[in-house]
């Protein structure tokens, strides 16, 4: 199988131009956001603040090089890809919020928001709260 090698860090990937961090992962969510393109940083800070306000008791960390909120387990993550922001909420949340997610692309527990799309912050807040509640029940 052909592998792509990043010319900057020398890491090998299965896909050409695989999105990744050269070097070490960011130490904080703010650092993650500040490493992204300037034109989406304000959107990412709005997303971060929405999740923080929804579940202030959750720990904010970086896991798998993604902004992550967790308590007992992982609650919600997000990551920037080439063409979208992926909000990793889990398949159970996607199914539970199916009606409110109509018209929003989802795949395997991930909400995919196009970079030029308005972020449904109220919906993300509600999903974060629901996931937090489900996490505490486990």
Residue ranges with predicted function:
Residues 1-138:
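Charge-dense, helix-prone N-terminal extensions
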């Amino acid at each position: 199988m052909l592998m792509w090698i990043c010319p900057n860090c020398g890491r090998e990937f299965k896909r050409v131009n695989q999105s990744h961090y050269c070097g070490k992962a960011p130490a904080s969510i703010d650092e993650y956001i500040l490493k992204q393109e300037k034109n989406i940083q304000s959107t990412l800070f709005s997303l971060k603040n929405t999740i923080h306000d929804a579940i202030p008791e959750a720990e904010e960390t970086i896991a798998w090089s993604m902004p992550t909120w967790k308590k007992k387990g992982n609650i919600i993550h997000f990551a920037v890809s080439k063409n979208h922001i992926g909000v990793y909420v889990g398949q159970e949340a996607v199914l539970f919020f199916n009606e409110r997610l109509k018209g929003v692309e989802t795949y395997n527990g991930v909400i995919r928001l196009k970079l030029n799309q308005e972020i449904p912050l109220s919906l993300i807040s509600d999903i974060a709260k629901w996931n937090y509640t489900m996490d505490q029940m486990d």
